Amino acid sequence: MTEITSFVAMPCDFIDGSIAAGEPIDCPSPAAAIQRAQGLWKIFGHAGSVAFSRTTDFEIGKFNDKHVLCRFGHVTDEYR
C-alpha cells in the first residue's frame, strides 16, 4: 500500500447567492497550504479559503476524508 498525503489550498467565492469552492492548489507542506489559503482570502479578496490535507492510496483508488488544517472567511459547508 502506497499512501500519498496531499496538502491543498482552495478559495471559495459567492456565486448566485451561495458559496462555491474554487480551483484547488497543491502545496508542498501543511504550512505552505495554510499560508496560501490565507493569501487567497486576505490578499486576493476571495470570500474565504480553506487549507486541508488528504491521504490517497492510488494502488486501490482509495481517497480518504479531508482533514481541515485552517479556514479563513466564508467556506462551503463541506469544510466547516
Language model region names:
Residues 41-80:
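Short, mixed-charge low-complexity intrinsically disordered segments
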Residues 11-12, 37-39, 56:
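Intrinsically disordered, low-complexity boundary segments flanking structured domains
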Residues 27-48:
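A short, charged, amphipathic alpha-helix used as a generic interaction element across diverse proteins
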Residues 23-25:
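Beta-strand-rich interaction surfaces with strong enrichment in secreted/lumenal proteins
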Residues 1-21:
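Short aromatic-glycine-(Arg/Gly/Cys) micro-motifs in beta-strand/loop hairpins
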